[in-house]
């Protein structure tokens, strides 16, 4: 079953966003590699695995400036600090 956003506003980037396509390919490969085994908590696992490198790379890009990184991510600085602590990145 193919899932396509029914409303244009659901899609923030172009329909063939390179990042979105890359993520889709990785998820398809992961599901294929499960080889019939159940994946528990896949949603949270994918979010965590995407969020950690996103936070690290944005912080590197902002030369460690958490205020700039939070602004670039579109989140409050307190939220960024909470996530960094949660993932053991501080």
From Swiss-Prot:
Task: List the stretches of this chain annotated as a DNA-binding region.
Answer: 66-85
According to the lineage, what is the superkingdom?
A: Bacteria
Which UniProt keyword terms apply here?
A: DNA-binding
Q: Which GO terms describe its biological process?
A: regulation of DNA-templated transcription
Q: State the signal peptide span.
A: none
Q: Its Gene Ontology molecular function terms?
A: sequence-specific DNA binding
- Family membership, please give it: Belongs to the transcriptional regulatory Fis family.
NCBIfam families in UniProt:
PRK00430.1
Entries under PANTHER family matching the protein: DNA-BINDING PROTEIN FIS
Q: What is this protein called?
A: Putative Fis-like DNA-binding protein
Q: Which organism is it from?
A: Xylella fastidiosa (strain Temecula1 / ATCC 700964)
């Amino acid at each position: 079953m193919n899932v396509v956003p029914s409303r244009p506003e659901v899609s923030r980037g172009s329909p063939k966003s390179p990042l979105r396509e890359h993520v889709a390919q990785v998820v398809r490969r992961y599901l294929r590699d499960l080889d019939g085994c159940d994946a528990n908590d896949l949603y949270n696992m994918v979010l965590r695995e995407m969020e950690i490198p996103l936070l690290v790379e944005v912080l590197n890009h902002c030369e460690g400036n958490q205020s700039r990184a939070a602004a670039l991510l579109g989140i409050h600085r307190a939220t960024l600090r909470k996530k960094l602590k949660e993932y053991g990145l501080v």
